[in-house]
Amino acid sequence: MEDFVRQCFNPMIVELAEKAMKEYGEDLKIETNKFAAICTHLEVCFMYSDFHFINEQGRSIIVELGDPNALLKHRFEIIEGRDRTMAWTVVNSICNTTGAEKPKFLPDLYDYKEDRFIEIGVTRREVHIYYLEKANKIKSEKTHIHIFSFTGEEMATKADYTLDEESRARIKTRLFTIRQEMASRGLWDSFRQSERGEETIEEKFEITGTMRNVADQSLPPNFSCLENFRAYVDGFKPNGYIEGKLSQMSKEVNARIEPFFKTTPRPIRLPDGPPCSQRSKFLLMDALKLSIEDPSHEGEGIPLYDAIKCMRTFFGWKEPYVVKPHEKGINPNYLLSWKQVLAELQDIENEEKIPKTKNMKKTSQLKWALGENMAPEKVDFDDCKDVSDLKQYYSDEPELRSISSWIQNEFNKACELTDSVWIELDEIGEDVAPIEHIASMRRNYFTAEVSHCRATEYIMKGVYINTALLNASCAAMDDFQLIPMISKCRTKEGRRKTNLYGFIIKGRSHLRNDTDVVNFVSMEFSLTDPRLEPHKWEKYCVLEIGDMLLRSAIAPVSRPMFLYVRTNGTSKIKMKWGMEMRRCLLQSLQQIESMIEAESSVKEKDMTKEFFENKSETWPIGESPKGVEEGSIGKVCRTLLAKSVFNSLYASPQLEGFSAESRKLLLIVQALRDNLEPGTFDLGGLYEAVEECLINDPWVLLNASWFNSFLTHALR
């Protein structure tokens, strides 16, 4: 019977039935008829609700799948299939919003058109007997009862059948099909009588005639008749199955399944070489902002106007000079590029009306920095296919780099709180469905924990820069447009604030394909002296451009202000994903939500409030050489968000490969911790696949280092 249920019903229905039986402490291996009955009841409830909607006039309408009107309000709220806590939450919410009387027992559905709860019954007996049993149990005239039988009969309160005839016929046909399928397998009598608790009568069903011929013709290869196949299935033992399949593949394949013990795995080998360097598209922890509070200047909101206003707040400009040269670049060109930006901004201020956008003069330094006329000339293949030594463009293998402490510091900083609020979520209207109350509560708690987080600042900065760069790339393809790097936030007191991080100058941008590259030069303010970690700034030329007075407890302190300049590039597809960095908030919220759900299912009630408000409880955050790090739920939220943000900022083929391959190793280790006695073949090949992704990417190297810490502590 269990096999039949798994074949006959949708996997989602089977999973819900399994959860329901587990919730009531019943063993589906023993109570197989009950398992089938629960699945049948669930399917009828879902079919009852399917395709029924309420239109804007409040009328009930039927909409088939794929119809654009499917965005209309569902006529029925499904209560059956939810765990008890969630089901009662839904019922209570419906009662609060509609004024309906709260039922004593959990009903199956709520009908928004007729404003009533519905109890669905599916019986293998006489419908009127089962109806009376239901009515006596519920003892409420407010709950509508609708009973279906496997014979096509039905009975409902006051003969009000709620649904149209076609919808009910669909349910009856499905029940009849289930009965037929059970009967053909010799399961129906047992199932029918189990509702009354009668003794089961074993009946031998012989398949004859056409059906027997069809059965014999539908067998896998190598089986001559149904009996042979039945005997094989009954005697099938899965042990040794993988080895058997592998041996069939090829004579060269000789894979032996090796047991995986605590002593089996070794640490992942991290590459040796010079320390890795920063490769993000903009500065992270080292960024400096020039800010204006409560902006109300003319043209407020226009990036160039905002940038000029922010630049005016700083008075410590001085003659710039190079303090950390770029090893391979022409450093005077970077210096001249910054001087050109200052000069052209000054020219704008001298104009009567400030323009909304600024296109830079195409000077020799900018042409060099933006790679103008540097691309190799493209030649039609037909013109050179006869060249005898035609070969692919040669490029060196990337140099291996070792992990450096700066990337861990970057991550730690991303998890910290700032003194500003970086996100204000839009109002999304009143909660309508009951489950929306819980969703809103979770969203609000999560937002409170991450709205001040530095990782959230990186999201908003990334969204702004990528949006501005993509817009400029499309609107001013041939121009070297000056793009201010801006973000907006609110102070603790709620005052609006506009921040300027620096500038981008965009190169030519005739982007036809998603992967076509636009070059840009970034110029970003910072107080970080690059000489402290020169390896981090390998790709940058760093200028000293001014002195900034910083408030301190004793007296103002003067600190040199630096400008980090580099040539960079991006593509349409990368900018498109950069514009959607807010998705990181959603991903980390979903991870937190799964933690809440796990806790709620153990406690059998929604634990959202307790989860966020119990400040004394700590949760695992991650692995470090010291062991498992723990922190508050807020720290967990911010750490998960920072991981998601860094996956976006440092997205690369190396990260894709490492994530996919290391996950396989993680699953094997997890199986060992769960005492599932995992076996492996070609473990060396898996390590090879993981380690070939460790080349020079700082974020991948940090993840590999964390993975080694996990291995150490997981296998103690």
Curated annotation (Swiss-Prot):
Free-text remark on how the cofactor is bound: Binds 2 manganese ions per subunit.
UniProt cofactor(s): Mn(2+)
Domain of life: Viruses
GO cellular component: host cell cytoplasm; host cell nucleus
Enzyme class: hydrolase
Residue interval(s) of motif Nuclear localization signal 1 (NLS1): 124-139
Binding annotation for Mn(2+) 1: 41, 108, 119-120
Subcellular localization(s) per the UniProt record: Host cytoplasm; Host nucleus
HAMAP family registered for this protein in UniProt: INFV_PA
Oligomer status and interactors: Influenza RNA polymerase is composed of three subunits: PB1, PB2 and PA. Interacts (via C-terminus) with PB1 (via N-terminus).
Function of the molecule: Plays an essential role in viral RNA transcription and replication by forming the heterotrimeric polymerase complex together with PB1 and PB2 subunits. The complex transcribes viral mRNAs by using a unique mechanism called cap-snatching. It consists in the hijacking and cleavage of host capped pre-mRNAs. These short capped RNAs are then used as primers for viral mRNAs. The PB2 subunit is responsible for the binding of the 5' cap of cellular pre-mRNAs which are subsequently cleaved after 10-13 nucleotides by the PA subunit that carries the endonuclease activity.
Protein name per its UniProtKB record: Polymerase acidic protein
Native species: Influenza A virus (strain A/Fort Monmouth/1/1947 H1N1)
